């Protein structure tokens, strides 16, 4: 791992990581020495080496968390720094650390005092990067454009916060072949047109830094519940009322991410937040409308309250707003609107009966408007 050739350093780290994953007794016996080596390589000049250092620390945390306990303050400092690395591959591997950290109940006492520093970093990294926006291309009205064949592929809808995407990604990310690692060293080479097209197509559905940080915030909310709110709510307020739509979008994403873990403690704020979110459905930016649909879906259990006054004040505007998004002129928003409406429908159950007329009108209009991909969701 100290070899002059960065390729050799990466291959060494990658090889040793496999022994961590299987809980090798020989690796356990030498773990202190290995952790010391990781600290030596933590400031390596090559981003790909730092990426594998972060990956190794995540593996150690998941397999032998007690080995990191004595140096946890230093590890936290390093991971906070690396989560904000200019190289997104490094940042993503570092962000995985917070996801693993939050899912490890044995470390909750060590994680708790660091929440005021971790939460702002996660929120910062949930903002769309310029590269992500560039790779998504034109995100304006596209409902009249026919679907491309590559657009029609399986996607995960609803359920736990991005967990299925992360699990799918993780199944193939544990071990990298020598050829795959060597290819990573050629990132500065020019892409051919087909490779670039593939990357553009995969951007929206791929596991990335933004989704990883949102998932980490979700798990932190499940683990610590009301304890995260004093640090999070002031930051959310700033973002939700920001003039910059990218900041607003990230704030709405964060609000949805904490829904499952903090629903009881967020309840006093929802009479203000739900109307605000309904208003966000009229935002000129499709990505804001799309994420607002998702977040409203996350709070659908509260919106579907049984009291008639509650339903008139909150449920009806949410239902009308989501049906409008089902008929939006942007395909991404249509998709999010359908998914959120399906979630709301499940929460309401038979109580939806009085509203069937507008629901059916919207769905019939959607059948006339949708192309093949969103038609599958509509069914």
Annotate each language-model stretch with its function:
Residues 1-379:
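Karyopherin-beta/Importin-beta family HEAT-repeat alpha-solenoid scaffold
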């Amino acid at each position: 791992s100290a070899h002059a050739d960065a390729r050799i350093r990466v291959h060494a780290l990658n090889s040793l990581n496999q022994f961590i994953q299987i809980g090798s007794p020989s690796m356990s016996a030498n773990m202190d020495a290995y952790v010391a080596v990781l600290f030596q390589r933590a400031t390596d000049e090559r981003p790909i080496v730092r990426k594998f250092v972060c990956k190794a620390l995540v593996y150690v945390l998941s397999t032998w968390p007690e080995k990191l306990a004595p140096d946890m303050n230093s590890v936290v400092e390093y991971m906070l720094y690396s989560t904000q690395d200019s190289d997104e591959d490094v940042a993503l591997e570092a962000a995985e650390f917070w996801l693993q950290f939050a899912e490890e109940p044995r470390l909750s006492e060590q994680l708790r005092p660091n929440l005021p520093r971790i939460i702002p970093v996660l929120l910062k990294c949930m903002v769309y990067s310029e590269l992500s926006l560039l790779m998504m291309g034109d995100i304006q009205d596209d409902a009249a454009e026919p679907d491309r064949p590559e657009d029609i592929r399986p996607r995960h809808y609803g359920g736990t916060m991005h967990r299925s995407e992360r699990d799918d990604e993780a199944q193939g990310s544990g071990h990298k072949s020598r050829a795959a690692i060597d290819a990573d060293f050629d990132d500065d080479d020019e892409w051919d047109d087909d490779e670039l097209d593939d990357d553009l197509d995969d951007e929206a559905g791929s596991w990335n830094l933004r989704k990883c940080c949102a998932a980490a915030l979700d798990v932190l909310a499940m683990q610590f519940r009301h304890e995260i709110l004093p640090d999070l709510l002031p930051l959310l307020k700033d973002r939700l009322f920001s003039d910059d739509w990218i900041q607003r979008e990230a704030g709405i994403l964060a609000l949805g991410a904490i829904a499952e873990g903090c629903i009881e403690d967020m309840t006093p704020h929802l009479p203000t937040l739900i109307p605000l979110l309904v208003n966000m459905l009229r935002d000129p930016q499709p990505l804001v409308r799309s994420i607002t649909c998702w977040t409203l879906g996350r709070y659908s259990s509260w919106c579907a309250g049984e009291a008639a006054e509650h339903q008139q004040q909150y449920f009806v505007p949410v239902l009308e707003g989501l049906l409008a998004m089902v008929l939006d002129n942007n395909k991404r928003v249509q998709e999010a609107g359908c998914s959120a409406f399906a979630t709301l429908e499940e929460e309401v159950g038979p109580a939806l009966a009085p509203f069937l007329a507008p629901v059916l009108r919207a769905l019939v209009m959607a059948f006339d408007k949708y192309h093949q991909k969103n038609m599958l969701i509509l069914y």
